[in-house]
């Protein structure tokens, strides 16, 4: 028998009346009625109401005890009267009359009055379920986690990870841990470096992903690998990205095609989303090429809940009387159109605000609009420069109806696509077109293998350098590098990228040629990826994988506004752990041991 409890605070029911029980937990709420004090005792599992009578010698103790103190009580279960039943809690038909009280740990406020005031405020937020500034919540995260909503997110996270692990094992995957201290990798973000005491002047790197290790596992003969992998990238925070570290369901398989990877992920994620969400889950995982995604949605992370589709109307404006767009087109730019249903009768301020917002927030230029009124006429700053034939072509291209409007964005192709995508998202949200009660997945496939970097003035890898190009070595030798596609794919849900993956290159000559195209010679490749190069000389199976982000999956299923809400001990947006005061300075002795010196 447990010394501290016979039951949890969510366990007692009406059929337990007159039983003697022992409960332990935190004093959640206290109500003093003079001769009686009612206490809501809370543990991890729930709440039970306690009744303290003033004829007990510990009555004064409970009267003076501060909320969130930890107590153990023994008492008799009693049925509540009909008018005092609390249907909002599962133990609401009973209460426990306390015969014995033991104070396990009493709340003590800091001696500094300013700090004590802060502590009282955060304690009050637990009882009242108030929101407090994020930094205060994170500084007192051990208190913040006592709030039901916050705790439930962490419980949900644990349950989702357990379910993912179960599905992987059921499909024959082996869970294998790969090293945390490793070498720096070219994943695209900055590494977190760890100085080596035993090797002065040398550094480990925390893994941005287990990319090379999981490929080495396939070369080693393992067939299906997975792990709940911690990944570390020195990146700025966003709503869907934590600074520093994140977790992913990392997996890799041998002798597979792209379709085999899709089948595993679609089956797994559909089951997880269907189990843990009240929203409907679209069973169809759409396939969209990268080129199509950028054209129709203005993003490689398309939100398919938004029905608006972007159209290319460059040819309609070519040689038109609207000189701004005409001039842009002559200089190699494009024009994209974004429909705005049922907005033709909106005042001019509606359109001006959208354009002003897009210019201010996204640095957009070359914006305009046309309204197509119900009587068939077209109005707006651009309409007067277009003849009826061009206006009809715009109607057809954008599939709009009388009473709709169209926004336009003109710029270089990539910039115009991005701005059009931002406008599409803005309109979808403000016009109430997005269904918030559904999860819609899509695969974005056929990414470019290479991209031209305007800053470095050179060709570089668009995504993962270890993926297989379409057409293999032949395309690398014969095609324009910017026309080569890769067997790379992203999984997107409701406009959030859940995962990236690829079918890997398994041939050494293709690896060397791909890196040569991006400006790396053999010596550089051998030095940077020595382990992989050595392994590639000893039989490499065709293999591929993917790594869905755990944090983003949980964020979506918890309907949380950002990743910090589903992380147990998160950093703030400045990459600071205000609870543990990290990052922090270290003393000179420690620095000397690591052969380091801080340069101010």
From Swiss-Prot:
MF term (GO), any: ATP binding
Binding positions (ATP): 233-235, 497, 549-552
GO biological process: aspartyl-tRNA aminoacylation
Localization annotation: Cytoplasm
Record-marked site positions (Important for tRNA non-discrimination): 33
Protein biosynthesis among keywords: yes
Ligase among keywords: yes
Pfam families recorded: GAD, tRNA-synt_2, tRNA_anti-codon
InterPro entries registered for this protein in UniProt: Aa-tRNA-synt_II (IPR004364), aa-tRNA-synth_II (IPR006195), aa-tRNA-synth_II/BPL/LPL (IPR045864), Asp-tRNA-ligase_1 (IPR004524), Asp-tRNA-ligase_1_N (IPR047089), Asp/Asn-tRNA-synth_IIb (IPR002312), AspRS_core (IPR047090), GAD-like_sf (IPR004115)
Matching CDD domains: AspRS_core, EcAspRS_like_N
Region (Aspartate): 211-214
Chain residues that bind L-aspartate: 187, 233, 463, 504
Catalytic reactions on record: tRNA(Asx) + L-aspartate + ATP = L-aspartyl-tRNA(Asx) + AMP + diphosphate
Cellular component GO terms, alphabetical: cytoplasm
Record keywords, A-Z: Aminoacyl-tRNA synthetase, ATP-binding, Cytoplasm, Ligase, Nucleotide-binding, Protein biosynthesis
Main location: cytoplasm
E.C. no: 6.1.1.23
HAMAP family assigned: Asp_tRNA_synth_type1
Similarity comment: Belongs to the class-II aminoacyl-tRNA synthetase family. Type 1 subfamily.
NCBIfam families associated with the record: aspS_bact (TIGR00459), PRK00476.1 (NF001750)
Role of this protein: Aspartyl-tRNA synthetase with relaxed tRNA specificity since it is able to aspartylate not only its cognate tRNA(Asp) but also tRNA(Asn). Reaction proceeds in two steps: L-aspartate is first activated by ATP to form Asp-AMP and then transferred to the acceptor end of tRNA(Asp/Asn).
Name of the molecule in the record: Aspartate--tRNA(Asp/Asn) ligase
Organism: Wolbachia sp. subsp. Brugia malayi (strain TRS)
